[in-house]
Amino acid sequence: MAKVRLSVPAVDDLDRMIVTHSLPADTRLRVQRSLRILEQFPRIGRQLEGRWAPMRVILGPWRWMLIIYSHEEPDDVVLIVAFQDARSSAAATAP
């Protein structure tokens, strides 16, 4: 099973989203549930292209929340690098 870790910038992203998007008090718990799948299936996310390659992305507890991560295969560690709003023109999945 892969170990899932959050980077400091990702935690900052999530904290900022909680405030700017008026997310509910249980947001961190919801995100934690969304991350569980990565323990067993670390490559489940779609691989990103361009400047975000070779990162991967899955959806968070809301369809608009992107969870950007990398999988370090030798150590079997998933590192969450960012949380983003998919509706933003600056999102990793934006055209």
Task: Give short role names for the model-derived ranges.
Residues 60-95:
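Enriched for short, Lys/Arg-rich terminal
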Residues 25-27, 53, 84:
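Short alpha-helical segments used as structural interaction elements across diverse proteins
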Residues 5, 56, 79:
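Amphipathic alpha-helical recognition patches that constitute DNA-binding helices
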Residues 33-60:
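A short, surface-exposed loop/turn module that caps and links secondary-structure elements
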Residues 1-32:
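Arg/Lys-rich, positively charged N-terminal/basic patches that mediate binding to nucleic acids
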